[in-house]
């Protein structure tokens, strides 16, 4: 099976981020952000990101509408605003996007991209990466300092108990509990539908 990368753009300068991708031979960036725009790092707005990648010789593919961590369908959320990954995984559009990714991974070195530098609690790892690894693919994470980190190392770090706390009794979640680690609802609802 194929291997694939994940990489968060964080608040890097575009040149720094492109250097990280080039350092690891990434040929295609798959943008997995539901909303590929940012008021904090506008250099990573969808169109600007695509242009920068293409100028660097890296292809760009947007699949955030199908693989994003904030699905449009309210049926994929629990009452606390967490995304129900176990349901989303069974969505026909999600499945089609996974199949498209797998086809691309046979031909190119692919990186799944979103905004978070740390993949530990990001949907690109917890949702998309989990589905792909369950299908036999290997996930590697390009970190902000340039190092490549195995998913086992990320998982081990994510499950370390905080100082002075007890370790969790049940490290693995059953399918009914497989969901985002935090609410993805906005902290403050928009005033109207045209406000972002």
Task: Indicate residue ranges for each PLM-predicted region.
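Residues lining hydrophobic/aromatic ligand-binding pockets adjacent to catalytic sites
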Residues: 1-196
């Amino acid at each position: 099976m194929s291997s694939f990368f994940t990489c968060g753009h964080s608040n890097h300068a575009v040149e720094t981020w492109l250097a990280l991708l080039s350092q690891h031979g990434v040929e295609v960036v798959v943008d997995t952000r539901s909303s590929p725009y940012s008021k904090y790092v506008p250099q990573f707005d969808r169109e600007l990101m695509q242009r920068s990648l293409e100028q660097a010789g890296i292809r760009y593919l947007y699949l955030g509408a199908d693989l994003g961590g904030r699905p449009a369908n309210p049926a994929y959320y629990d009452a606390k605003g967490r995304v129900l990954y176990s349901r989303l995984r069974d969505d026909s559009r999600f499945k089609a996007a996974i199949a498209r990714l797998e086809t691309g991974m046979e031909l190119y070195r692919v990186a799944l991209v979103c905004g978070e530098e740390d993949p530990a609690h990001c949907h690109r790892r917890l949702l998309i990466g989990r589905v792909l690894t369950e299908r036999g693919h290997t996930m590697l994470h390009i970190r902000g300092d340039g190092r490549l980190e195995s998913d086992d190392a990320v998982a081990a770090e994510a499950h370390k108990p905080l100082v002075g706390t007890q370790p969790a009794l049940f490290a693995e979640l059953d399918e009914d509990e497989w969901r985002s680690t935090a609410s993805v609802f906005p902290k403050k609802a928009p005033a109207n539908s045209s406000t972002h």
